[in-house]
Structures are given as structure tokens and as C-alpha cells.
Swiss-Prot record:
Gene Ontology CC terms, in alphabetical order: actin cortical patch; cytosol; endosome; plasma membrane
Subcellular location: Cytoplasmic granule; Cell membrane
Native source organism of the sequence: Candida glabrata (strain ATCC 2001 / BCRC 20586 / JCM 3761 / NBRC 0622 / NRRL Y-65 / CBS 138) (Yeast)
Gene name linked to the record: YPP1
Protein name: Cargo-transport protein YPP1
Keyword Cell membrane: yes
Amino acid sequence: MFIRDAVLQALEARLLGASEFHSTCNALDRALVVQFRLQYHTGGDSVITPATGKVLFGDIDKVEMLSRRFPLDKPLLDLINKILGNCAGIIHFSIGEFEDAKVRLQQARDIKLDKTFDVYDMYLGLENLYYTACLRQDEQQISDCLYDHLFDTLSFVPSASEALTHQCLWKIAKRLKGHNNLANLIKIWPENNRALVFLISIIASDNGAYTEFSKDNDEMILKYGMNLVEKIKFPKASENNNYHLEQFMLFLQVYFKNIVPDQAASTEWYNFILKAMSKTFQSINVAHTALFVMKKIGSDNEKGKINGTLLRKEALLNFVNFIRYSNKEFKLNKNYNDIISLLVCYNFVINEFTKKDNIDNLFDYDKSLDELLSLLVFFYKEYNIPLSEKKQSLDILENPIRLAFPPHVANTLSRSWLTLYNYHSTSLSALLSFDLLAFLANCVPISRSMDEGLFISTVFQYALTLAKQRDVETAIKVLEKLILERHPNCYKAWHLMALCHSTKENKETAYKIVCSVLEAMNENMKDLTFEEKFQYIYMKITQLRLIQDMFGTDETLELIPELFELYNTLFLGGANQKKVTINGVYDLDMTLQDIWLYVCSLYMKTPSTDNLQEAETAMDEAMALEKDHWKGRYLPLRAKLNILKQQNKQALLDIEKAIDLDNSNIDAILCFAELIFDVEKKSEEDLTDEYYKLVPIEGIKECSKNQSENEDRLFFNATDRSAATARLKLLLDSAVAESIEGYYTPEVWWSLSQIHEQFATKDYKLSLMKCIKFEELRPIAQFENCNY
């Protein structure tokens, strides 16, 4: 029994796309490895060359000899022979040996497997049918062959974890002419396979896509579901839930995830789900389907409630039930029946809901994130898939991993890792513990086999994370080897590389990179995407920062008109002031405000009377662009401007507003530190004398009166000043403990060292050393400036 369980687990792993197996049968393990290698060579745009085919045939011969050398029971031997027969037929087909392919495929087709292997047998049958059909002379004959024999092989709706089976169905559907006409398919194929007919009908002709939503088809599918649920009864204690309903639910999961748009689902689906719940006992598939159905219906404001029931909350409750039932199943079987569906549901809930949706004692958003990570680790270890742990994930160039998952599994796993990365991307602890690198390192080998754009985006985020950790040398290598050698026009990668080089004492390399890329972007200006135009603006600002560092502020101020001319050339005249893209929302007003704030900061570098007036003008322009959803971005810089104008009280008001909006606003905290240290420097002796004095009420009133005469007086007395210093200490400690920007900002550590020195604490030297370290590693601009 143990051996049979190990064999089934190996087959389960293979259907998921695994490449390493431990079934206790060496011949089977090696046969599955040959099958994996064949899939690796035939996936995507890859082809099998005669040389590769020769190597694979040699491996097949070795496995066949091994299976003959050691006695195996007939069911296991048949399984191995059928796997190898399919592999040999596919190799012959791929290298143009069609007669040999026909013979080997027929031999494999004649092998009847034990019912124990029915799930894997269906996959092998579909694979065999596809290549057998492809041996026909033209597309019509291929389509006819598939129509005639598909339902001789396809006997049930595969679960999401039977990913290779789904991949075969996609390939078959691509060659079926007119397969997405549901009304015709119902006439051709029998009623007892109706859920399968529905599944075939929603697969579009292009691999990886689904058909568009059709209201007529939706009504047809709903009608079938209603008729089905009306006929069945609640199962007895000795019975399982209705098989046909469970099959229909598997189809609906695919249908509602990929076909039905938000607000398009009929409210009758809600009634169907309620009836299905009343006719089943703790059905994992019903709870899974209910999550998507209720979320889709509940996305419409008018349908957000049905009979007083809040559907958004109802969807979450079904997710809770889905997880509860799945965990019960795991306790019974020591494994999940459909682990990919679990990952899909966790992804869906984490991306569609927030912490505001938490339900006491039932649903916790943060806990769901932890459970997603635990489930991923379990998945990798259970199916012997290489997992990048923290130590091994530091350099993906040193530790490359090659994976070849079926599209659905690859998409689910990559989304899972990116979901974890995106949620934790602003976490300092996740950055310092290398968790962020681990998330991305596990996503990179998956994305490599999927979409080139996803691969480049993931590698870029990996390099950006390295740069944030100040591991700029490795970041530069990753950018060069994995992005720029393949895509020399990836401007954001060049921008990040320039910022990495700018951490070094010699800024010339960074300056040369920026100038070369800006010249290339100028030559290709007409072809730039919306995102690349934003990249152009911020790279121009990086160039000006480098000029300021290398040649001085006056030379930089002379080039400011070029920045505004560039903005006008790129964006003015366009109708859209806001552009929504796959990477987020790009707001032109926010970018223009950034330009004005940068100009303001430049004029403040040389605070003459004229320059301060120019700075005020730039600040007024920036403030005029303020919007509610990014309120107060100008406040820290206006506070610094007020400090230069010796209007300390107004500066403090701006600081308070900024910290109230965001208590981790590093610029505001540093302005606060500047105010406090400036006051202490001016009146150090008075502060020492008055520190322990208590001020009576009359004294406070007198102090208030004096303050009205002197608007720049910030503190009533030394006690008030001490309280402000204590508050600053809390803000600084919080910044270096929780904020990525705060931890790597030298001025934050310098301010902390000043406080530690003032109170003679042992952390003075540590803070000072951190300040020096991060000053030496400071880029010319924030690394995030290239992340557009």
C-alpha cells in the first residue's frame, strides 16, 4: 500500500510539472524524468532536433532495459511502457519520422492501465490522441479525428492540479474547428458529459486564452445547473456528494475565474449556489465556486446585497469554509487533493480583499499571507521542486534553477510569489532578512518559461531589491547578464545601473550611462511608451543631480529649462492627464509636482535673497498641483524653506502636518531634528539652567504672551524642549526599525548619534558608524526613482 501511494504521489507530481520523483520504483522515476525532459524541449517555441531526439531515445532504451531487468508487477510495468511509448511517438513525430510515430503511438494506445491510475491514464490518452490526430494530412482531418475520439478519452473534468491534462486540452481545443459554439457542441456530444462540453467550449483557439463572456451561453449553463441541482438529493451518511454536481463545480471554477467579468453575473447564480449548498455536505468544490460567484456578483454596487446579505462578506465566509474543508481533507489523507486550487484561492482573496475585510475569529488578512507562504513551501518540498532558500537566493546567477511547469501552474506559482513580494516590499525586516530576495528568486525561474515581459520585470525587481540592500555589485551583474544583454533598450534597467554606479566615489560612469541613455531615448522619442516617458523625465532629473554633484548648483540651475521643455514635449497636447497601465497609475500632475519640488530644492542649495524668492515661486507651483490622494507631499520641503527664512514656527506646523499624514515621513522627521538641534545650538546654556525648573500657570501665560511677540520661539522652556527631543528620538528609532528609507538614510543615523551623544549612551558610536557607512553607499537619487 505504501509503494502504491508513493507511485500515485509521483504521478501527481508529474501532472503538476515536477522533474524529480521518489516513487520507490527507479524505472518509473526515470521514465517520468524522460517525460519531463521531453516536455521541456517541446514547450513554448522549442523544438526537438535530431541530436536531442537521439539522446532521448537512448534514455528511453535505458529505462526499458531497467524495467526488464528487475521484476515489476504488471500494472506498474504497463504504466511505464505507456509513458515511454507516448514519449517515443512524440519524438518520432517531432523529428519528422511519421510512420514510426504512428506505430509507437498505437502501441501505447493499446496498453490498458489499471483503474488505480485513471487520472494519469486520461492525461496519457489525451496526449496520445493529440499527436495521433496531428499525423492526419490537413487541419480538417485533424479536427474530425479529435471530435470523433475526444470523449472516448476525456471522461471527467480535471482538477486545477491536473495541469498537464489541462495543457493537453488547450492543445486539442486549438485544433478543433468551431469548438466554441456551445449550442452545436451540445448537439454533437452526449448529455452525461455536459460539464466537459462546457469546459471545451470556453477554451479559445489561442493557447492561454479563454473565450469572451456570452450572455446566451451563461443562461444556457445556468439552466443546466439549476436543472441538475433540482434533481439531486442531500447525500446519506454512507454516500458522497453528487458526482455530476461536483464535476459541474469544477467547470464553474474555471468559468467564473476566467470568463465572467465583474458585474456581469446574473443574481440567479446566487440562488444556484444556495441550492447547491443545501444538497451537499461540506463540499470543497461548492465552497470554492461560491467564493468566486459571490465576489463577482457582489462587485456590482446594486447587487452588493441580496436579501440583506452582503455578498463580499459572504464570499469571504465561503473562503473560510473552503480552507476548513481542505484542512480536514489534509488531516485524513496527509495531502491536499487539489493544491493548485488552494493557491489560486489564496491569491484571489489576498489581491481582492484587504485588512478592512477581516472577520473576528474567522478571517485574518495577515494570517492568510502567512498561510500562503507555508502552502508554497509545502508544495515545493512535497513535490521535490527546487526551492530558493534565503542563503541560496542571494545570487540567481550563481544558483540558476530550471523549471518547466504547465502554464496554469506556472501562472499560479509566479502570482503567489509576486503577491508575497508586493505585500512585503516596503517591509524593512523582509528586506534585511532576505525574504524579498527569496520571493523573487523563486519567481524568476518560473517567469523565464512564461512571458518575457514578466521575466524582465521580475529580474528588475530582484536587482532593485539588491540595490536597496546596497549590494550594488551583484545588482549590476544581474542587470547586465539577465536584462541588458537580451534587451538593450530596457531604459529602467540602465537607470538602475546608473544609480548603482552613483554610490561609488567616482560618479563619471553613472553620468556617462545616463547621458548615453538619454540620447538614445531622444532619438526614439516617437516610439516611447507612456511608462518610458516617465522614465525619461526621472532619468533627466538624475542627470541634473549628477551635474550638481560633479559641477555645482549654479551649472545645474542653468539646465532647468531643459527639464521643463522635455516635460512639455513628452506630455503636453495629450488628452489623458492620468494613464492607467499594467504597472499602476501614472499621474502627470504628480510628475510635474516632482519637477517643481526638485527645482525648489535646487534654489534652496544657495539661499540668496533672489534664490529664496525663486524657491518660493517653485513651491507655489508645486502646491497648486496638490490632490487629495497624494496630499502633503510638499510639506517637508516647505518646512525646510521656512527654516531658511527663519520662520521656525511655521516650519514646525508643516512638519506636524506631514507627520500626522505619515508618521514615517523621513524628510519631515529630519526637518524636525534640524529645528530641535538648531534651537539647542543657539541656547545650549539657557537650556541647561532651566531644564529642571517648574513653570507656574502665570509663567506659562507670560511665556505665551512673549511668544506672540516672538513668532519663532518654539518651546516654552527646557522641559518642553526635552519632551520634543524625546519625541524626535521615538520617531528616529521607529524610522530605523520600520522604514527602508529611514534605515538607509545617513542623516537619520546622524540625528540619532547627536541624541545619544547628548545623553552619553553607548549607542553613539554605532549610530555614527551607520551614518558613515550609508553615506558612502548613498546613491545620487532614491533607487525607487527608476521603478516606473
